[in-house]
């Protein structure tokens, strides 16, 4: 059985020392780089775009898991492929033609993910669940790092795992927002496959050790 994936969120890195933080993730037990792209429209915050992606593409030695919190994401599918994205996740709430969007992501040679805001029902995925590689469950309201974890996420993950099994989907369940050393084990038990961790990693005294702890499977 595959071990769970830990994906530090670059949004929480020190952008004055970005290359240092990239090297830290490279040297750690982390599996992916999680990259949040925000446009100030779909979410209130603006993060970063292609220049930062190009830096990550140049120095990162692990896959780039790019999470688009932007309106009409299909406009940029090829551009994100060119910037190094290996997985491209779009929000179901922001994509007018989700099936076509997923097809275009896969045609460009990337893995396709769909993200759900905290209020969004998992059954909106029924008709697309077998076409995607990842479901990103937002466990905070999207747009800002460092928010408090929404407790209902556990029940949502359990229900989503059941749906994936019923539909015979191989999609991974990714949790994004408020993941820490106190809740990560319960998330794994609930059915999570990928843990996105921002402040928990980058605000800790020893980020490499924190990542190591997040990789542990408690008995």
Model-inferred region functions:
Residues 178-190:
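Acidic, divalent-metal-coordinating active-site segment for phosphoryl/phosphodiester hydrolysis
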Residues 34, 174-175:
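Generic enzyme active-site microenvironment
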């Amino acid at each position: 059985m595959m071990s769970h994936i830990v994906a530090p969120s670059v949004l929480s890195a020190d952008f004055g020392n970005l290359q240092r933080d990239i090297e830290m993730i490279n040297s750690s037990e982390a599996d992916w780089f999680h990259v949040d792209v925000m446009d100030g429209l779909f979410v209130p915050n603006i993060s970063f775009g292609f220049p930062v992606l190009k830096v990550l593409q140049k120095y990162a030695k692990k896959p780039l898991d790019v999470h688009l919190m932007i309106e009409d994401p299909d406009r940029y599918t090829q551009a994100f492929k060119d910037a190094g994205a290996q997985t491209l996740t779009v929000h179901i709430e922001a994509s007018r033609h989700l099936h076509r969007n997923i097809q275009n992501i896969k045609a460009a040679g990337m893995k396709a993910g769909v993200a759900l805001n905290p209020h969004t029902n998992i059954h909106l995925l029924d008709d697309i669940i077998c076409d995607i590689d990842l479901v990103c469950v937002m466990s905070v309201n999207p747009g800002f790092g460092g928010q408090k974890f929404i407790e209902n996420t556990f029940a949502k993950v359990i229900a989503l795992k059941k749906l994936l099994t019923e539909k015979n989907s191989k999609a991974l369940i990714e949790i994004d927002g408020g993941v820490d050393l106190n809740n990560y084990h319960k998330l794994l038990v609930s059915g999570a496959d990928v843990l996105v961790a921002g402040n928990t990693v980058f605000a800790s005294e020893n980020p490499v050790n924190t990542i190591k702890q997040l990789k542990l499977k408690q008995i």
